[in-house]
Amino acid sequence: YAVIPKNFDAEKPSALVTGGVHGYETSGVQGALQFIETKLAQYAEQVNIVVVPCVSPWGYESINRWNPMALDPNRSFYSDSPAPESAQLMQLVSDLALSLTLHIDLHETTDTDNSEFRPALAARDGVTHDNWNIPDGFYTVANTPSPQIEFQKAVIEAVKKVTHIAPADENGKIIGADVVSEGVICYDKKSLYLCGGM
């Protein structure tokens, strides 16, 4: 389901908040729900905000990264996507004719990435899995073509007030990507078909 404004105002910017694209990343779902309960009304005067708190409800209920067809919804944001979760979210954004100024896609990295989900993916795809350091702390993933580093830094500074920021590993990386600013890495979200690249 989605929480959408009663009346879209074309004069205001539009933002999308998503959680639970990977269902087992439960803090994204809980964070989106908490945002709805505690902050949405505060920002609704300035911004058209759409919140989809749980993109992959089956994954959330079954504590799973993938959907029942063993597809990763967060690698499936492309035309004619076989992942219904991804296709439905893209259709919602299209139906609402959202021109997004901001998209916050809430994720977390858990120990089960190394112990369960990444090894299963490697086995399915017939490739080798190397463990990567699971970061301890908050970090952001900027979009490589337009990283908006000053915005990322502002997010990091705000988050520092409530929790610690993930340090780089011994190779200067977080989840295998170069750290471009404290707690900030970049992915080309569109080419990876990520939710944040819509």
What are these regions (language model features)?
Residues 1, 79-83, 192-198:
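Metal-centered catalytic cores of metalloenzymes
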